Amino acid sequence: TGWAMFGSVSFIPLFVQSVLGTSATQAGITITPMLLGWVTASIIGMRLILTVGHRKLGVIGTTLFVTGAFLMTLIGPNSSQIMMMVFVTMMGVGMGLSIPSFLVAVQTTVERRNLGTATSLLQFSRSMGGTLGVSVMGAALSIRLASNLSASGLDPKLVTALLDPLPGVEVVVDTGVRLAMANAIHLVFVIAFVSAAFGLVAVFFTPHQELKEKSLESES
């Protein structure tokens, strides 16, 4: 899910600017609900773990995230910004609920003296997954965009200007370029959804030892 999450955060603003034709400010506003949902759900999730159980909470959170990621694959040039904000909010809430459950799942499977190492390894793995995800999605986006521009009779060199514009310089994007960009970013969203779906499958294979059981073992 880290792969899909970091990839989405990186490329959703690009879609809002290049395809919907809005400003950088509006692009930032679009992903704000995702971050707010993430933080809020994390706080709530920590309280729910003891009552619901980390595995159920992980399934619920990851399912929400996967649903949001799937809905993002349905957006296009005619989609509204509000619709995208709803979808990314689902993803943010899903991550907020699932991350605490993953943390507890790891911590309940190791001995107390190894808690620090296990937690650090989890954080490192998530960061590495996010970095790898952004790299793979960025490469896929560049290749697909260059192909789309060539097929439309446009200059493939526009890829650099579109993906890495100069500060303070607004790139004029016509309809053909917007369609090419929409198709390229759609591939990114599909990759994010597929990786999130694999994450959901992996949740069902997490250890099912809850906090209360772990506490009893420690006391004995």
Question: Model-found features: residue ranges?
Answer:
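Intrinsic disorder in cytosolic terminal tails and internal cytosolic loops
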Residues: 169, 173, 206-220
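12-transmembrane solute porter fold
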Residues: 1-148, 187-199, 203-208, 213
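A membrane-interface helix-boundary motif in multi-pass transporters
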Residues: 143-193
